[in-house]
Structures are given as structure tokens and as C-alpha cells.
């Protein structure tokens, strides 16, 4: 009887709190990328250009990039459950303001406010998930939490796009705010109060990392390799409508197909990067660069364009786990006192990449046209290929 009671208690203290974290991750993942499917309707309704609407993605990314390391350090002394609840309040407020926005300026501010909750959530969420389970199940617990992000890409973004097309883009943001309400209730009820508190993050630890060459190189690889795809992905809906020739009503279905490709790629990428992340990343980036270049030539053809876009999705997020493992491995080797801070800074690097990619994509759309976004994104990813080769050379010499 006692063993059964302990098993039930273990499930309560592990699986259910992880579900609450996954719900939060699903909401955050949905709000980050859902504007991709709504760019055209947002631009038309607010009477702005597609390029300006693209700032809703790059602006959000910069909010995460600057907010993650700075706010993680500033809030390090707060109780982790209290901080988790505060982050979801910010998330709800940000999306509610977005839904009420009548101007582009207010909508952009709302997006940046929402972004502040993103970076810190994934910084503390991973450590909370790890502490909820036995040590030999920590990796699985963290993976379960991040499943919320994958599910958001597969279902949240296409569903949000469908809702936006059927009822207007404001309805999508109200729906995401409702997700935040569900997440905060789940966190309040299911996440335990007696969480082990992590040691405070220090700005001095961030400075140590920023002085380390191999880690700085890995952040540059993250920004270029992950961000290059966003030169085209940010404008995927206009590409599908204006180049490939799909009706706006078909975009949500195609984003669902893209999301399935992302989910498959995530699974493959995690397994491929287990033994030698640098080698795996080199080949992932090289193939992705080639696919992006090909897309510029196939985008105007429905069948070939759709197949190439699916392939782009397959590779787009395949590198994420490898990039995270690479940074953690390097931090443990060079700056062992600041592994968590290095992980937070890599989240910032991901979002710097998104911001750069989205911004560059906007410049291309305005200057030489939508069809050129994929191959220029491919050039950006090719930069990551070269940096990865350099990093492999450095690590080989260090052995």
C-alpha cells in the first residue's frame, strides 16, 4: 500500500506538473510564430506593408533575445513557482493588448511585452522540469516540456492561422490569451510550491561566457544556422499565395504540413546529434542551405514548390537540439560555473537569428522581390556551415 501511494505521489509530482509546463510552452510557441500565417491579413487590416508586418516576428525575437539573459539574472532570487505565474500573467496581458490593438505601433509593443515572458520561461522551465523527476529521467522530462513547442508548430500555428482567416487576426490573439489562462490555472494547481531553488544567475557569469571564443563561435553558429531559414519562413504565407499560387484558405493546411515536417525533423535531429553534434550540424546546415537555394527556383511551381517547402521544414528546426547540446558541452568544458547562463544566452542567439533573418527578408521583399528570400537565406545558413567547420577544427586541435 505504501509503495502504491509513493507511485501515485511520484506521478502527481512529476507527470502533471510537466503537463502544466508543456501547456505553457504550447501557448508561447504558438504566439511566437502564428503571425507567419497572418501576415497578409494583418498588413491589409492595419494598412501597412508586408515588410512592416514582418517586424511583428523580428520585434518579438529581439524582445526574447534581450530579455532572456538580462531578466533571468534580475529575477534569479524569486521563487521559481512565483516567477512562473508572473510570466504567464505577462503572457496573458501581452496577447490581450495585441487583440485590442488598433494600430501597428501598439501591436508591436504588445508583441515585445509578450516576448519578455518567453526567454525566462524556457530558462527556468527546463530546470523545473529536471527537478520534478528522478535524475535518470531528467532528459525525458525536459523533452516532454519542449514537446509543447513542437506541438505548437504542428497544430497551434495552423489552427491560429485558420481562426485568424475565419474570424479575424484579433480572434487568434484572444485564443492565445485563453491558452495563457489555462496554463496559469494548470501551473497554480499542479506545479508544487516546494521547488528546489537554483543558484542565482550572475552578470559576472555572463561576462565569463562572452569572453570565451568557442562559446561565442557557437552562438554565431546558432544565429546564422537557425536564423537563415527565417529570411524565407517569415514570408512563407505570401510565398505560398503569390508565388506558388495557393488560395489564402489553403495556407493553414500547408502550415500544418510544414509543422509535421518540423516535428519529424526534430526527432531525427535529436538522435543525429547525440554522439557528435558538430559533425551532425555541419551536414544539417549544408543540406538546408542547398534546399533554400533550390526553393527560389521551385517556389513558382505548385508540386515542386510544396515538396521543397516540406524539405525546408524538415531541416528548419532539426538543428535545435544539436545547437543546445553543443553549447552545454562547451560551457561544461570552458565555463562550468555558468552552464545555465550559457543555455539562456543560446536561447537569445536563436532569437537574434530570427530577428536578423526576418529583417533581412523584409529588406529583400522591398528591394528585389519575394522570390529571392530563400536563396539569400541559404547564403546565411552557408555562413553557419563555414563557422561549424571552423569550430570542428578548434575542438579537434584542443583534444
Model-derived regions: residue spans:
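Conserved MFS/SLC helix-loop-helix module at the cytosolic interface between two early adjacent transmembrane helices
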Residues: 66-105
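Paired small-residue
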Residues: 90-97, 102-114, 303-311
Amino acid at each position: 500500500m505504501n509503495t502504491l501511494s509513493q507511485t501515485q505521489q511520484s506521478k502527481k509530482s512529476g507527470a502533471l506538473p510537466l503537463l502544466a509546463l508543456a501547456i505553457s510552452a504550447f501557448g508561447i510557441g504558438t504566439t511566437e510564430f502564428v503571425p507567419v500565417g497572418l501576415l497578409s491579413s494583418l498588413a491589409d487590416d492595419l494598412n501597412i506593408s508586408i515588410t512592416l508586418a514582418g517586424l511583428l516576428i523580428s520585434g518579438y525575437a529581439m524582445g526574447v533575445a534581450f530579455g532572456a539573459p538580462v531578466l533571468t539574472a534580475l529575477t534569479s532570487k524569486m521563487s521559481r513557482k512565483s516567477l512562473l505565474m508572473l510570466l504567464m500573467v505577462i503572457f496573458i496581458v501581452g496577447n490581450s493588448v495585441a487583440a485590442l490593438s488598433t494600430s501597428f505601433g501598439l501591436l508591436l509593443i504588445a508583441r515585445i511585452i509578450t516576448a519578455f515572458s518567453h526567454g525566462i520561461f524556457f530558462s527556468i522551465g527546463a530546470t523545473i522540469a529536471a527537478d520534478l523527476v528522478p535524475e535518470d529521467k531528467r532528459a525525458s522530462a525536459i523533452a516532454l516540456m519542449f514537446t509543447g513547442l513542437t506541438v505548437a508548430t504542428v497544430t497551434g500555428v495552423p489552427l491560429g492561422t485558420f481562426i485568424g482567416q475565419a474570424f479575424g487576426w484579433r480572434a487568434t490573439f484572444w485564443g492565445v490569451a485563453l491558452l495563457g489562462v489555462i496554463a496559469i490555472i494548470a501551473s497554480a494547481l499542479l506545479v508544487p510550491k516546494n521547488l528546489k531553488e537554483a543558484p542565482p544567475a550572475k552578470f559576472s557569469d555572463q561576462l565569463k561566457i562572452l569572453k570565451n571564443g568557442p562559446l561565442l563561435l557557437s552562438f554565431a553558429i546558432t544565429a546564422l544556422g537557425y536564423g537563415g531559414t527565417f529570411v524565407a519562413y517569415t514570408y512563407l504565407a505570401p510565398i505560398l499565395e503569390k508565388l506558388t499560387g495557393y488560395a489564402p484558405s489553403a495556407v493553414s493546411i500547408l502550415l500544418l504540413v510544414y509543422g509535421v515536417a518540423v516535428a519529424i525533423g526534430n526527432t531525427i535531429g535529436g538522435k543525429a546529434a547525440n554522439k557528435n553534434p558538430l559533425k551532425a550540424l555541419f551536414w544539417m546546415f549544408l543540406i538546408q542551405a542547398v534546399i533554400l537555394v533550390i526553393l527560389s527556383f521551385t517556389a513558382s511551381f505548385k508540386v515542386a514548390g510544396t515538396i521543397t517547402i516540406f524539405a525546408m521544414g524538415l531541416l528548419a528546426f532539426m538543428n535545435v537540439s544539436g545547437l543546445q547540446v553543443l553549447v552545454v558541452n562547451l560551457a561544461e568544458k570552458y565555463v562550468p560555473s555558468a552552464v545555465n547562463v550559457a543555455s539562456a544566452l543560446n536561447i537569445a542567439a536563436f532569437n537574434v537569428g530570427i530577428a536578423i533573418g526576418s529583417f533581412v527578408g523584409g529588406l529583400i521583399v522591398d528591394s528585389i522581390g519575394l522570390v529571392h528570400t530563400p536563396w539569400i537565406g541559404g547564403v546565411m545558413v552557408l555562413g553557419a556551415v563555414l563557422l561549424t567547420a571552423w569550430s570542428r577544427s578548434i575542438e579537434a586541435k584542443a583534444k
